[in-house]
Amino acid sequence: MSNSYVLVINSGSSSLKFAVIDSQTGEALISGLGECFGMPEAVISWKYQGEKTEEAITAADHHHQHAINRIVGLMESLGFAQDLVAVGHRIVHGGEKFTSTVRIDEEVLAEIESLSDLAPLHNPAGAIGIQAAMAAFPSLPQFAVFDTAFHQTMPKKAFTGAISHELYKQYGIRRYGFHGTSHYYVSREAAKMLNKPIEQASFISVHLGNGASVCAISNGQSVDTSMGFTPLAGLMMGTRSGDLDPGIIEFLMKKGWSQEKVFETLNKKSGFLGVSGLTSDARGILEAMENGHEGAKLAFEVFTYRVAKYIGSYLIPLDHLDAIIFTGGIGENSLPIRREILGNLKLLGFVEDEKGNEAARFGKAGIIAKSELLNAVAMVIPTNEEFVIAQQSVELL
């Protein structure tokens, strides 16, 4: 076999992202998105050799299956089908059961579905994607890569909530953390860049996108992370509140708010969108700020302050720091946000490398600041979760 390509699938409730990844280089040969599933305007689009194509999905229902069937046709027409060795699925929640990538069988699929209580928006959709891919590619091995798996090395003191232990035993209420595949990838890439064995490297990984989280990594392992039982905890995000006094929920419900309205507000109408009253997009926030928009300025300040607070607190579980790693759409591209976060860390001695910070954008890695006090750097590493999913799938063949 000349190539080892993996079809990587990230299945949402009304969408499906896919890419064919070369498991040796990480190159995406083709990538695409099916969206608006369950609606008349359902479409699938893909990008191949710089050209984008879009098609309507005309079927009345089962849009995940129709999208994956179209992907099969694409693979065959482009000549990739014979080089596909596996299908890798991004699954959001693995609970305590899954600590690493696993080959999917009926038992694993049932376990993923049983964890739907912990991730009601994500795991049922992931299971639908698996079932559709198994029907479309019956002879290909399928693997599940879990967002939570990397964080299963957290010590009890980091993942235990300060509530009745019975709630943990009965319902599994604890910190799980997410973005694990991204934090795993960038920490390995940072260790390579710094020419340091990952087993001896310690990082604070800062994944900033529409969802955002910070992870403390000691000797290559996750020891704490900002997201919690759900991806709602931790940092302020595009539309999510992040950490919040839980008493606010009771307060709003006493004011007549329904449970659904409270959590829709916290998940979809908070964060950048809620504070600015304008947009959930960091680029829109920066643009409005330049035009004197007070809400945008406040959103920028709250966001960068909270990220810096988490970074500072994550020095606690580490015995040394090699680097702060910025990744994710905002972390990789937003120079003003990185600059403000590092400015908030003045006591840690980080001095910006202005040329380095300017250069480390749009897919380029680089060192953007140094601290002589900590003998550490701040750096940008573009994430590549699909590459990890492809690699870890191939490793289990």
From Swiss-Prot:
InterPro entries: Ac/propionate_kinase, Aliphatic_acid_kin_short-chain, Aliphatic_acid_kinase_CS, ATPase_NBD. GO terms for molecular function: acetate kinase activity; ATP binding; magnesium ion binding. Transmembrane segments: none annotated. The keyword S-adenosyl-L-methionine does not apply. It catalyses: acetate + ATP = acetyl phosphate + ADP. Its cofactor is Mg(2+); Mn(2+). It comes from Vibrio cholerae serotype O1 (strain ATCC 39315 / El Tor Inaba N16961). GO terms for biological process: acetate metabolic process; acetyl-CoA biosynthetic process. This is Acetate kinase 2. ATP binds at residues 17, 207-211, 281-283, 329-333. Mg(2+) binds at residues 10, 385. The record marks 179, 240 as: Transition state stabilizer. Its main location: cytoplasm. Catalyzes the formation of acetyl phosphate from acetate and ATP. Can also catalyze the reverse reaction.
